[in-house]
């Protein structure tokens, strides 16, 4: 009996000292993401990972994590989380409206800086501002399940952290290890939007008529409401195909633009399938992908063609800019 009581006391002590977040409101589409699953296309496993890699990396750096640590990605409206435990730091990146609710005061939050939470504090992510995705990094190690060396959640394939599901109300996010909370980090950064999305020719570019190519490269398209982590549907003038709208299925990559029978292009995003049978007219260059995924429904875009060498150089420049931003965070 003595040992049972002693065990119960120890168990309660462990429970009370545990650091965790209680999910009060899960948000519209909140998932755990990291860099994604590399080198698995050949076995039918999508890449997944954070949609906007730059903002994801910055969120982790601001809380002192390795930049490829798991973080929460949310779309439009984020979660309302209540924290229990020792002091912890968080950071939110993107163009996001949020509040920190403490015992006696509610504070409007600022993105791109580390923020301390204490026992009983709440973080309420209200909305993204004329954009889609935001990131919440937690300073420490989140208890998560990994599959194929990644915790990235793909809800269509039902793989990754949280049993492949979106965050749900009332669930708990356990933190097994905390970072040093005394270091304050901040970055002066403003997200910008682009209207011209640069692309290279797709492997089936010549399957389209001259008129279809002209429409693709000169006309405006509107981001559809039928857009998710798997693909971005675009609405606008129909792109004419001169061979066949259904071809032998081929491998897909992130950013490739397929054109189905209705003539409306679809950009493959991070959770896309690994093969597809629609002609591929173009591929969004890697340097523009982060900004593309942040464009909300109703936003107008145009495509601009560049050659492969330019696409490679533009990505090197974008990657260098990202690394410079990371290095500015002490």
Regions inferred by a protein language model and the residue ranges of each:
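Conserved "landmark" site that anchors the functional core of diverse proteins
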Residues: 2-330
